[in-house]
Amino acid sequence: MGICSSSCCGGKSRDALYENVLAENEREAVADLLQYLENRAETDFFSGEPLRALSTLVYSDNIDLQRSASLTFAEITERDVRAVDRDTLGPILFLLENSDIEVQRAASAALGNLAVNTDNKVLIVQLGGLQPLIKQMMSPNVEVQCNAVGCITNLATHEENKAKIARSGALGPLTRLAKSKDMRVQRNATGALLNMTHSDENRQQLVNAGAIPVLVQLLSSSDVDVQYYCTTALSNIAVDANNRRKLAETEQRLVQYLVNLTESSSPKVQCQAALALRNLASDEKYQLEIVQAHGLGPLLRLLRSSYLPLILSAVACIRNISIHPQNESPIIEAGFLKPLVDLLGSTDNEEIQCHAISTLRNLAASSDRNKSLVLEAGAVQKCKQLVLEVPVTVQSEMTAAIAVLALSDELKTHLLELGVFDVLIPLTMSPSVEVQGNSAAALGNLSSKVGDYSIFVQNWMEPRDGIHGYLNRFLASGDATFQHIAIWTLLQLLESEDKKLIGLIGKSDGVVDMIKQIANRQMMESDNEAEDDDEGEVVNLAQRCLELLGQGGSKSHIEG
């Protein structure tokens, strides 16, 4: 505090009484402040006499005293950060408007320190702190820039401030400072830009301010923090479809930069790079481009990591990439099948399990060859082992995957031999409508063109009331989709030419009666001609079932 001491004799004229009075007040304030600073550990500088002494220096016309005040605020806020009121913030905000570089630098440092506190974040903005900070961001002095940007970065972490900052005119200067040659300024600026990417409106303001090219360019920065901030910001920006289109039009190197960052030495950068690719891969163009940019190898390495966030980001990304039919074979050939199957049982993380099984289902979607490879990788055995114990969301994905595999005529016998009925039949009683529907769809797919229907006979009444119980429940459900699945399944069984199975169906009075009701319901309402195609198909299936049961004559009885 040598400056404070010497400033007592500052160059004011002793001739004017008014200036002498001010000088006396200033001398007293400096003397008091020196005393308080000697006992700083026990002194509260944010209220009472210590704050009054500081304020006297702040509002002095003596630049040395103003510098001393700003330096004191910077020093005390370095070690004492707590909620303060406008009596404390007012003098600091006043100092921000000062034209002196030293005063600006220390005042913005003090404000940045106080802006760590949640209550202070809101009050600083309410008291008009943004405009002087924006002005300081445009200072030619790097230290002033750094402190001002750091303060705005802290303010931008509070939800209440984000929209105000976005509309304040701060985004343009922040974007320019993100390109600063000073790494501290660059880090603070990119951190602030990241904090502005958590809402649709703010993201749009950021895009309008020209931040996208700067963020993409900085992906190649050598600084890990800058890489992280820019990768995460772009990941958030890519959540919006319009922004993805803009990125696709203007940022040709984005995918390659992100693929490179999945091999960063920093796990947090790797994680965000994979998540950014995942968000981009919501669009077909990017699904293909990531594979073309040799992104599969790095993603597979992340998938095999022992670090849960890396696994999650990688499997979420590969799930989106696997949506494109052209990517199915490249992903399989890259060696993803076994690791994906292993993920189903190696973690209790519901999200990872969902992404893994959904990816396996996508990979099996468009060719029997790929379905066979997914089956050979042990996917169905793993699902059968786990499906009754996993959360409902995972059950839904697992049963959907089995239903897709069951579309392959070549695999149906193999699936039946694996004992999938043991889990599919009980799951038609799940509390989840999705799980019920997927399980029934799988049963329906397995019932078509199997060849040997003996397993259907064995499972007619068990487990859990067997196929008979499932058909009963779905036909009685009143749900058009469920009835459609059940009637279609029943028709496949009746067309099987398996006498035992057909006999069991014929003896199931409840099932037969419901088939009649569904067929008759449509015929009785046929005069209004308002039935849609789906309803008509359900009725046609029901009538066909009755014909195969030798009860098709019931139609003329009802019409008569």
UniProtKB/Swiss-Prot annotation:
Organism annotation: Chaetomium globosum (strain ATCC 6205 / CBS 148.51 / DSM 1962 / NBRC 6347 / NRRL 1970) (Soil fungus)
Pfam families per record: Arm
GO biological process, alphabetically ordered: establishment of organelle localization; nucleus-vacuole junction assembly; pexophagy; piecemeal microautophagy of the nucleus; protein localization to membrane raft; protein localization to phagophore assembly site; protein-containing complex localization; ribophagy
ARM repeats: 39-76, 77-116, 118-157, 159-198, 200-239, 243-282, 284-323, 325-365, 409-448
InterPro entries: ARM-like, ARM-type_fold, Armadillo, Vac8
GO CC, alphabetical: fungal-type vacuole membrane; membrane raft; Myo2p-Vac17p-Vac8p transport complex; nuclear membrane; nucleus-vacuole junction; phagophore assembly site
Membrane topology, record value: Lipid-anchor
Organism lineage string: Eukaryota, Fungi, Dikarya, Ascomycota, Pezizomycotina
Single GO MF descriptor: identical protein binding
Task performed by this protein: Functions in both vacuole inheritance and protein targeting from the cytoplasm to vacuole.
PROSITE patterns: ARM_REPEAT (PS50176)
Keywords associated with the record: Lipoprotein, Membrane, Myristate, Palmitate, Repeat, Vacuole
SUPFAM superfamilies reported for this sequence: ARM repeat
Domain of life: Eukaryota
S-palmitoyl cysteine: lipidated positions: C4
Protein's name in the database: Vacuolar protein 8
Cell compartment(s), UniProt: Vacuole membrane
Annotated lipid attachment (N-myristoyl glycine): G2
Family the entry assigns: Belongs to the beta-catenin family.
UniProt KW Ribonucleoprotein keyword: no
SMART domains per UniProt: ARM
Record has Membrane as a keyword: yes
Gene label: VAC8
